[in-house]
Amino acid sequence: MGFQKFSPFLALSILVLLQAGSLHAAPFRSALESSPADPATLSEDEARLLLAALVQDYVQMKASELEQEQEREGSSLDSPRSKRCGNLSTCMLGTYTQDFNKFHTFPQTAIGVGAPGKKRDMSSDLERDHRPHVSMPQNAN
């Protein structure tokens, strides 16, 4: 159970310690003190195999977590909508219909052609625009 929660930091630190132990110019113990049958020492090939196994287990663990997360998302309350919206045009049509209904339920505003307020007579506007302006001098002829 604890191996499933194995953090990548711990795997990386094991790798660093193994590599640091094999890269020292002067070993911690002399060659005479260490026996070749010492069970605590790993050969370079064994260290690589151990690291490969750790990485493979970590990748499998993350993949299974991702699958579980996707299964949880698939069983959420949004799944009927995703089943309904298998066709993009159906989804877009439904969304536009909802927006259109919202637009028609807004309260009416007093803006536009039929809005109450000051009404101007178009004929008087045209006459006023065609009369000479006060600041312009008129012809004496």
Curated annotation (Swiss-Prot):
It is found in: Secreted. One of its GO terms (biological process) is monocyte chemotaxis. Keywords: Amidation, Cleavage on pair of basic residues, Disulfide bond, Hormone, Phosphoprotein, Secreted, Signal. The modification Proline amide is found at P116. The keyword Amino-acid biosynthesis does not apply. Residues 26-82 form a propeptide. Residues 118-132 have a biased composition (Basic and acidic residues). Residues 64-85, 111-141 are annotated as: Disordered. Disulfide bonds join C85-C91. Residues 1-25 form the signal peptide. Its main location: secreted. GO terms for molecular function: calcitonin receptor binding; hormone activity; identical protein binding. The modification Phosphoserine is found at S43. InterPro entries: Calcitonin, Calcitonin-like, Calcitonin/adrenomedullin, Calcitonin_CS, Calcitonin_peptide-like. GO terms for cellular component: axon; extracellular region; extracellular space; hippocampal mossy fiber to CA3 synapse; neuronal cell body; neuronal dense core vesicle. PANTHER family: CALCITONIN, CALCITONIN-RELATED. Belongs to the calcitonin family. The CALCA gene (HGNC:1437) encodes a small family of peptides including calcitonin (UniProtKB:P01258), its C-terminal flanking peptide katacalcin (UniProtKB:P01258) and the calcitonin gene-related peptide/CGRP1 (UniProtKB:P06881). This is Calcitonin. The lineage of its organism: Eukaryota, Metazoa, Chordata, Craniata, Vertebrata.
